[in-house]
Amino acid sequence: MQHFKIITAIFALSSSLVFSQNYKTSSTAKSEQGFPKVDTNGKAVFQVYFPEAKSVVLEGGDGMQNLKTEIAKRDNGFWKITTSALEIGFHYYWFNVDGKRTNDPNTELYFGYGQPTSGIEIPSGEDFFSDKNVKHGKIVDDSLDSNVTHGKRNFKVYLPPNYESKKFPVLYLYHGTGEDITGWEKQGYIKNILDNLFADKKATEMIVVMDYGVALSPEQEKLPDDYPRTVVSTKNLDKIVVQELMPYIEKKYKTNGQKAIAGLSRGSYQAMYIGSNHPELFSAIGSFSPVIYEGTELQPFKELPIDKLLKSKQKPFFFLGIGEKEDKRFFGYNDLLTTFLSQNKYPYSQYKSAGTYHEWLTWRRCLYEFAPKLFK
């Protein structure tokens, strides 16, 4: 009997060591939490305490579809969920606990899908967004009172490592639907990406303004859901950027007058709208996972003044980026844009992110490709 106990103890210790060697705690886990864990093949293990639950199901965003999971409830009230290999990159996720959407208490929360949401990072083997031993910039919070939306608007500003030494160009950068101004900082790792690019002399140092992508007045907030709210919001945003935000930034921060604009998903539409409407103000327009709103088959650019680019003297450089595994509708928007630009011999570049979905690894890579092309 004693011999059996020793063998059992050795087996348990051995299993623990194998588990710890093959799996590492996700970078999104809270400090001192051991889960979720990810192995070298992208398989994940979640352990959550829902003692009264009868059903716990793992759910998530684009990169977590079609997952195979093994779910087991233990006598101590913990549920263990093991998955098949996940796609690389950052994924939003949550648990369906007896029909109720519930975040993982083990992870940091990220604003996605219109609410605080759990996240997991599946390593891609890249380090361009890692926190390296380089000179660091900083991100500050700021705000202004808008006469367009009749309220306070918050935004974040990235200041480059050598901010105190001279004046800098400015990139205005937008998040996507269901996200907010924290997206580029938390999920996007913008600070690490730019710090590393600047340290390697691969991009011109710049200020980045991460503005809020919703711009509706209190009255417009009451518009029905089937109303083209995004177009209304974008037209308001156009006024805010040109009449309020830019003058504010140029007065308060050390800017040199050069500007570019970019965004992801809905933010791509906003960047294209504002950039196309004011081509004289921007040297480049970046569209990451492009979206076009309220277009028709005959008039795909009905609510996007992209034809103004053709008449402009400055002709801002146009950048398009998309994930290889994104939904076909995003490729449809992308193709409409590349066809238009090619037919009109307008300068642009196309980037495709290998193996990624409509998610943050795509957009991190887009920024990494886009930033070195700016302010040359």
Language model features: what each stretch is:
Residues 1-22:
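Bacterial Sec-dependent N-terminal signal peptides
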Residues 20-32:
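A general sequence property marking short-to-moderate contiguous segments
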Residues 33-38:
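Short beta-strand segments of immunoglobulin-like
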